[in-house]
């Protein structure tokens, strides 16, 4: 019996992949740091063993899958090589696995996790579908027809894949610790496009994506009239969004989605276009769109007294704009309060003015200290550099969250890719203690 051992099993992609293999009746275990991470809940539900790092975890007969964050000098990887056990990097293993199915890669600077989750949910309503989402969610079906997965452009990892289809949501400059500029990002997506085997579904409203060259058909979607799939007559409501879809200027159907903001319409359009191309029943698509409950850390909302709390992974100015827009659509009468933790010094420095501009669209802004990456030097930048660019912005720590109580009818949006949830948890605890 083959045992799949994951080095760094709590990573979002690694956790998802472990769940898929387990669901396909394989024996799975893994190791990681002992600090609790949100991805391990799904692993624990499946009774997948999570061990502390130890070279003795590695045994002959295992298949070793290593997370990209762990170097070849990691004790378990060294142990595997000493035993002549091949070590598969996450993205290479995933590339091999998907070749057995009709595979759909979802990529883009923003929106890929939400779009992957939505596509997986919609496809499941029509055909057996396995999926891997970048929020740590994975699901494997032994007799799958489709394999839907999130493909990240960071360090060009997505070039390990040769999918049948690719959805490209947008191209934007991010990860300044790796990419030099927007042209460098574009070159990565262009290289990816040439590896797609059947078709590309791309947002035609994105100027960079319009320049993509491919050996396969490129189907464009968006709001502009030149797109193959166009959303028209958009009704933005507090219970979701309704819009008509026109295919090459001919009315196709009317769809309702549970999401808010223009970005949610675009994500749904991408899914509708792919399903149309694959002849998925439109009634199944319409039904599944109305039952989608979202993905982890993307506009996750809960009421707390008179306030509403939203947890969101937004960590780039474009994403902050989208999240604030969505909050205003759903809660037009409420004050919008942004609690933001910048993620990495390199990103914060590169987009300092853009962060200030996007955050200023909230009614009030609170800033947490910058969450640095282990790979980078702090440099000269401080959170005060961002604060002074935003009128009325205040600094906040996990011990001073009680200041948020004054926003009695507020939507409190906790945004960031670091440990922003620590601040949210501190505030929830503060409110609960006060109520006793």
Swiss-Prot record:
Main location (coarse class): cytoplasm
Gene that this polypeptide is encoded by: murC
Single GO MF annotation: UDP-N-acetylmuramate-L-alanine ligase activity
Keyword DNA repair belongs to the record: no
Enzyme category, top tier: ligase
Entry function: Cell wall formation.
Compartments, record wording: Cytoplasm
EC numbers for this chain: 6.3.2.8
Descriptive protein name: UDP-N-acetylmuramate--L-alanine ligase
Pfam families hit by this protein: Mur_ligase, Mur_ligase_C, Mur_ligase_M
Record-listed ATP binding positions: 108-114
Pathway: Cell wall biogenesis; peptidoglycan biosynthesis
Substrates-to-products reaction catalysed: UDP-N-acetyl-alpha-D-muramate + L-alanine + ATP = UDP-N-acetyl-alpha-D-muramoyl-L-alanine + ADP + phosphate + H(+)
Origin: domain of life: Bacteria
Assigned protein family: Belongs to the MurCDEF family.
GO biological process: cell division; cell wall organization; peptidoglycan biosynthetic process; regulation of cell shape
Keywords noted in UniProt: ATP-binding, Cell cycle, Cell division, Cell shape, Cell wall biogenesis/degradation, Cytoplasm, Ligase, Nucleotide-binding, Peptidoglycan synthesis
One GO location term (cellular component): cytoplasm
